[in-house]
Regions:
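Extracellular beta-strand-rich solenoid/capping regions of secreted or surface-exposed proteins
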Residues: 220, 225, 241-255, 264-290, ...
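Acidic Gly/Asp/Thr-rich repetitive segments characteristic of extracellular carbohydrate-active
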Residues: 204-236
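Short glycine/acidic-rich loop motifs that flank beta-strands on beta-rich extracellular proteins
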Residues: 231, 243-245, 260, 264-275, ...
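Non-cytosolic beta-sheet module surface loops
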Residues: 92-94, 103-107, 176-178, 226, ...
Length: 640
């Protein structure tokens, strides 16, 4: 969806019949008015091109709804496997300067892609698995495989400039130069010009900082001088290497860059506690805007990484605006952890117009009494815990007040691989409104629970509103604890849930139930009204080779998804058997069954041969099914 200021949320709301009273209740913080393009989700000035919709060369569409399949983390449950020297091609529907590629490569490996425009190579990206691939076992997340670990965080992203301007109608090709490669989608963006140094400012360059070099001391000194002289700190174009956590302490400081595509603070340490901004609890009226933050962090350190892009209390009326935050423990964890007599609360924080992606844990968590704060008009994608959360925590020794009146509005939240799209854990008077939550298959779309210690919902007298959200293809059959989670999930463990109002939400193609719960919902606890779901179309599945219908009970992990179209009021989906891409070689061993040779393969996106004499099938594998090809039987197995 492209950014068009002429289409406002007000117009969209009028078309869809949303009342003025509904819109007036979408925020309770003082912040500038944003005109929204859509009823659901954030504005975005980029256009997405799904790899499955592209022209494929030596590449295959991979589709599955199996819980542990790589496809489970892909947009719309499908991606494209591109063989070496294979490619995908598409036509740009509008002009662009930059692109973002979402990809997967095997754990411990690298790959390389070339980008061509109208057949001419203009860009090369080196792809690396090092920030990705975590293994989840209940509460624990590991950096390497475990016996009961579920592989997750298998997709990552890379972005950069084409080096040329891409015009509408140009042909864009992504070619795999080396290694194993899966492509989920490509996003093209018309990038605005870099922002110039503002008035009454000092530049990081004035302190000797240079792009590509360590700038830690320069940044610390520049922050000190900006605070003392009441100047804005401007960070010009470039990637500045930072090898330590940066402390911010004081009122009224503004740090701004040339734009999220131009200015990057790259934290170079992979050690716990050595990256991000740590906000001192006497700070107020802080502004961080128009730059990106990235890091070398690759581990949660058993939930002790202490490596968040932003951590601490931001005091009163602070703002995080137009930042691109990637590869941290969390995007922002907001809360003070001082002793009870010295607690300072975040009040009136605005996080907006930002991209918070591919972090190991939460996107944003408003904790420790944070109030009157809002996250809005942001894209939160590919994170490894709740994408957006408000937790009424009471850390040891703090006696923290309750979180209250926080707002999550008009965010696009997608592809979370663990926990909820949005999580509300206690508190009062919050609003969750007009968000688009899509492909959140690590947990519920929106979860409301008392599973964690802290304030529950006992003080929630005025109610928490969950209105006008759309939840698409979200929920899970297994939350890593053996429980299914619906588009909405309610879990009562350490206190009652009360005064929650779900109204005018839309659920599309939920993975499991619309609502899952561990207690009976009443109007006093959760009032549900005027919610709809849009997944009632009949679906017919067709084998592309035989043109015969496939039973709904068939194991669809034995097939590649080849697209769909709507016909006579139903959706027709096309599937190609995995056996069609398997080539039987003379050296392959086999057994016999009723005069037919039986060959064994793994049930991966790209099946691997399993030799009869070296494989302990019943001990190490689970039988998935079989298909016939050229008079032979291809038997598929998945590793236990």
């Amino acid at each position: 969806m492209t950014f068009n200021l002429k289409r406002t949320f007000l117009m969209s709301a009028a078309i869809l019949g949303l009342g003025v009273a509904t819109m007036n209740n979408t925020t309770n913080v003082k912040a500038e008015n944003i005109k929204y393009d859509n009823v659901y989700g954030a504005n975005q000035n980029y256009r997405r091109y799904e790899a499955t919709d592209m022209t494929l060369n030596n590449a295959d569409v991979i589709s599955s709804k199996e819980f542990d399949s790589t496809v489970n983390e892909a947009s719309d449950n499908s991606y494209v496997s591109v063989k070496q020297n294979g490619s995908v091609n598409f036509v740009a529907k509008e002009g662009a300067d930059g692109l973002t590629v979402r990809y997967t490569v095997p754990d411990g490996s690298t790959s390389k892609i070339s980008v061509l425009v109208n057949g001419k190579k203009v860009k090369t990206f080196n792809l690396d698995s090092k920030w990705a691939w975590q293994y989840v076992d209940g509460d624990n997340v590991y950096d390497s495989p475990r016996e009961n670990g579920h592989a997750r965080f298998r997709f990552d992203e890379v972005h950069g400039f084409f080096g040329v301007h891409v015009n509408k109608g140009d042909h864009v090709t992504i070619q795999n130069e080396e290694g194993s490669l899966g492509l989920d989608f490509v996003e093209l963006e018309n990038v605005e010009a870099p922002k110039k140094q503002p008035a009454n400012s000092i530049s990081l360059a004035d302190f000797g900082a240079k792009s590509g070099q360590d700038s830690t001391q320069a940044l610390k000194e520049a922050i000190k001088q900006a605070r003392e002289k009441h100047k804005v700190l401007y960070i010009p174009e470039g990637q500045y290497l930072i090898n330590d956590k940066i402390g911010i302490d004081g009122d009224g400081l503004t740090i701004t860059g040339a734009g999220m595509w131009y200015t990057d603070l790259h934290f170079t340490s992979n050690e716990a506690g050595k990256g991000g901004f740590n906000i001192g609890h006497d700070s107020n009226n802080l502004t961080f805007s128009h730059f990106s933050m990235s890091s070398e962090l690759t581990s949660r350190y058993q939930q002790n990484a202490q490596y968040k892009a932003f951590a601490g209390s931001l005091g009163k009326n602070s703002k995080i605006d137009s930042l691109w935050i990637e590869h941290f423990e969390c995007g922002a964890w907001i809360g003070d952890y001082a002793n009870a007599h010295d607690m300072k609360y975040t009040d009136g924080l605005v996080i907006e117009n930002s991209r918070i992606r591919n972090n190991l844990a939460d996107g944003v968590n408003l904790a420790q009494g944070t109030k009157n704060s809002v996250v809005r008009n942001s894209n939160v994608r590919g994170n490894g815990d709740d994408s957006l959360a408000s937790w009424a925590s009471i850390a040891d020794g703090t006696e923290s007040a309750i979180t209250e009146s926080n707002v999550f509005e008009h965010n696009t939240i997608e592809l979370g691989w663990r926990a909820g799209g949005i999580g509300i854990f206690g508190g009062k008077n919050h609003k969750i409104t007009n968000n688009l939550i899509k492909d959140n298959r690590g947990g519920a779309g929106i979860r409301i629970s008392t599973v964690f210690d802290g304030h529950n919902f006992d003080l929630n007298d005025n109610g928490i509103e969950v209105n006008n959200n759309q939840i698409v293809k979200s929920g899970t059959t297994n939350d890593f604890y053996g429980l299914k989670r619906g588009s909405f999930d309610f879990e009562r463990v350490k206190g009652d849930i009360r005064n929650i109002r779900l109204n005018n939400n839309n659920i599309v193609d939920g993975v499991v139930d619309d609502v899952t719960k561990n207690f009976e919902l009443t109007n006093e606890s959760v009032k549900i009204s005027n919610n709809t779901h849009s997944n009632d179309k009949a679906i017919q599945n067709i084998n592309q080779l035989t043109h015969q219908e496939i039973s709904e009970k068939e194991n669809y992990t034995l097939y590649y998804f080849d697209g769909e179209h709507e016909q006579d009021g139903k959706v027709v989906r096309y599937w190609t058997p995995k056996s069609s891409n398997i080539k039987i070689e003379s050296w392959m061993t086999y057994s016999n069954s009723k005069d037919k040779k039986v060959y064994n393969f793994t049930n991966e996106d790209v099946p691997s041969f399993l030799p009869e004499e070296k494989t302990k099938f019943l001990k190490d594998y689970v039988y998935q099914g079989e298909q016939e090809k050229n008079g032979n039987i291809i038997r598929f197995w998945s590793k236990k």
